[in-house]
């Protein structure tokens, strides 16, 4: 499991995360709700090895995730799908996907197997495999970004704001794809502002405010919480 204990992150004198505690059990989808600036992306950067913490620990299956290099965390089974997708728009869909397998570049046969698996998970991409990634719709580009992360063969997928900028119908399709990824055996930590969509597929969740965990609970508990309903569900 993922276990984060008293994790704090500073940017100079500014503290972005304050003693964050959270867990993701094997096979779970856990949502991290929070507004812009709440600290969600900072947490993900820290878990993926892009940012060093000021204090605290984070482990996946007992192996430390902090203090190393990002490629080490990918090799340990933790992959980040970043906010904004960050595709190479002039490269084909398939070339973008193959870049996600860089950490396994010596295993050509395994890369081909994984490519087939992600096409099974995202069948809409099969007919677009030779098209420039930048020519796809926003929803299709998000699916390419998720699929590229899966090419690293993660056991834990960190998804940062996958619904950003997408129309409601497309959000529904993307979250259905995330559910399929989870059903294939991948644990998911999902950072989102779209609480309705995220809690629709999550097992549990946390609310991050000002870099602190202010609330946590099951899907049902968070959907029924007046603070969540007011701040994130608009009811």
Predicted regions and their residues:
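Conserved ABC ATPase signature
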Residues: 132-136
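Conserved catalytic motifs of ABC-family nucleotide-binding domains
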Residues: 153
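ABC-type ATPase nucleotide-binding domains, specifically the catalytic core motifs of the NBD
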Residues: 12, 30, 93-113, 121-123, ...
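ABC ATPase C-loop
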Residues: 149-150
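Conserved ABC transporter NBD signature motif
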Residues: 56-65, 76, 110-115, 217
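The feature captures the beta-strand-to-loop junction immediately N-terminal to the Walker
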Residues: 33-35
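Helix-to-loop junction immediately C-terminal to a conserved catalytic motif
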Residues: 48
């Amino acid at each position: 499991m993922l276990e984060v204990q008293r994790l704090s992150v500073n940017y100079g004198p500014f503290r972005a995360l304050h003693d964050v505690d959270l867990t993701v059990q094997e096979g779970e989808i856990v949502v991290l709700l929070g507004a812009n600036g709440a600290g969600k992306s900072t947490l993900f950067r820290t878990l993926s090895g892009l940012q060093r913490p000021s204090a605290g620990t984070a482990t996946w299956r007992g192996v430390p995730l902090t203090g190393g290099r990002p490629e080490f965390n990918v090799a340990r089974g933790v992959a980040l799908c970043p906010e904004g997708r960050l595709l190479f728009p002039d490269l084909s869909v398939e070339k973008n996907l193959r870049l996600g397998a860089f950490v396994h570049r010596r295993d050509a046969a395994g890369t081909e197997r994984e490519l087939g698996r992600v096409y099974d998970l995202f069948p809409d991409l099969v007919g677009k495999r030779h098209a420039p990634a930048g020519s796809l719709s926003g929803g299709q580009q998000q699916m390419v970004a998720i699929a590229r992360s899966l090419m690293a063969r993660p056991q834990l997928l960190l998804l940062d704001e996958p619904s950003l900028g997408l129309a409601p119908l497309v959000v529904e399709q993307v979250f259905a794809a995330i559910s399929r990824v989870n059903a294939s055996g991948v644990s998911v930590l999902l950072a989102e502002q779209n609480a309705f969509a995220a809690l629709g597929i999550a097992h549990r969740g946390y609310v991050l405010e000002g870099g602190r965990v202010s609330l946590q609970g099951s899907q049902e508990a968070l959907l029924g919480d007046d603070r969540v309903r007011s701040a994130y569900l608009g009811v």
